[in-house]
Amino acid sequence: MTTERTGILLLVSGPSGSGKTTLCRRLADEDEAIYSTSCTTRPSRKGERDGHDYHFLTRETFEQKVTNGEFLEYAEVHGNLYGTLKTEVLDHLAKGIDVVMDIDVQGAAQVRSCADTSIKAALVDVFVMPHTEDELLKRLT
């Protein structure tokens, strides 16, 4: 009897400068997990690729996806919308692929409150903090 493994959703949150992005990128670089690709309405920056760094959407398209309930989490930051599509995460999990999300505390709360049973069953929640307040201040300056 073979049991198919379902992926894990590793939700990594913490304050800016805590090291969460470094942790997530390292996991993805070592092929331990897929780094989730967020959607955004901000313009792409030099060197960024659509579908790799972000899914670049118009505000209208993004807002329609919000209305349709397509986001696992989303927020507006500095006038731009950012969010993670449910289908992208669920598709990877169903294939047994682990997904890592680098997310702020508010976004993590949205993911935790998701009603989808597949998301809830796969969720591993990690909060990252630097060792000391001095270390956090050093990272932010």
Each model region followed by its residue ranges:
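ATP-dependent small-molecule kinase phosphotransfer cores
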Residues: S38-V99, V105-Q106
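Walker A/P-loop
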Residues: T21
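Extreme N-terminal, non-catalytic leader segments
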Residues: M1-L9
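Post-Walker A helix-loop "phosphate-sensing" segment adjacent to the P-loop in P-loop NTPases
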Residues: A28-T37
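The feature captures the helix immediately C-terminal to the Walker
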Residues: C24-R25
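Conserved phosphate-donor/acceptor-positioning beta-strand/loop module used by diverse small-molecule
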Residues: V99-V105, S118-L140
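ATP-binding Walker
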Residues: S18
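P-loop (Walker A) phosphate-binding loop of NTP-binding proteins
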Residues: S13-P15
